[in-house]
Each structure stands twice: as structure tokens, then as C-alpha cells.
């Protein structure tokens, strides 16, 4: 339910403006590109109460359609930044382990090419 998301639309717009400044979003943000082909493998982790949930899953679908390897981890009931708020709980540790395992696999692939 988007009404329970702690990171809201206003915060999201501010965040993108602060991050991008005057940069071209299509260059600075891979998800804003029309063609996602050729991007590096991706790991996308998001909680069901994260404002970016729908945007993240749509990006993952676009990556997959473009032939980019993409692992998606959805955490039921989690909000944006949950793993930073409670880094020592099991769900956060599993989330971090998943990130690390995906990065290791991607780096192993890059060493073979």
C-alpha cells in the first residue's frame, strides 16, 4: 500500500533534483535511457512499502527484456532504507548477503570476458 511508504513523492522529487542537478538524466540514470542493452548485470532490491517499488520492478523488467542479467529481491513489508535503519536484524543481513553474492557473480563474469 503506497500510503504507508516512508519515502514519499515529494522526497523522491527532491532527491532526484539534488542528485541530478543540471545533468542529463538519460546519461546519469541508466533507467532513463531508451535502450538498456549492454548495461552491466544488475541486482535490484526493494521493499514492498518502498516508494520506488513499482519503479524498480519496471526497471528490472526493462533490463530483462533488453537481455541484461537482473536479479530482483523483494522484501515483504520493508520500507526504503530498512536495511540501514536495522542493519543487524536477519532480514537486513540476508538482503546484504544477496547484494554481495550478486556482485561477486557479476565480477566473476566480467573476469571471464
Question: Model segments located where?
Answer:
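Alpha/beta-hydrolase superfamily serine-hydrolase fold, recognizing
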Residues: 1-113
Amino acid at each position: 500500500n503506497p500510503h504507508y511508504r516512508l519515502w514519499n513523492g515529494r522526497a523522491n522529487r527532491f532527491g532526484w533534483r539534488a542528485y541530478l542537478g543540471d545533468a542529463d538524466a538519460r546519461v546519469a540514470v541508466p533507467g532513463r535511457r531508451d535502450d538498456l542493452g549492454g548495461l552491466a548485470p544488475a541486482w535490484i532490491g526493494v521493499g514492498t512499502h518502498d516508494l520506488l517499488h513499482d519503479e524498480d520492478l519496471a526497471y528490472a523488467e526493462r533490463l530483462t527484456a533488453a537481455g541484461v542479467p537482473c536479479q530482483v529481491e523483494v522484501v515483504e513489508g520493508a520500507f526504503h532504507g530498512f536495511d540501514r535503519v536495522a542493519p543487524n536484524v536477519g532480514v537486513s543481513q540476508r538482503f546484504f548477503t544477496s547484494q554481495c553474492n550478486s556482485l561477486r557473480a557479476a565480477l566473476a563474469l566480467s573476469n571471464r570476458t
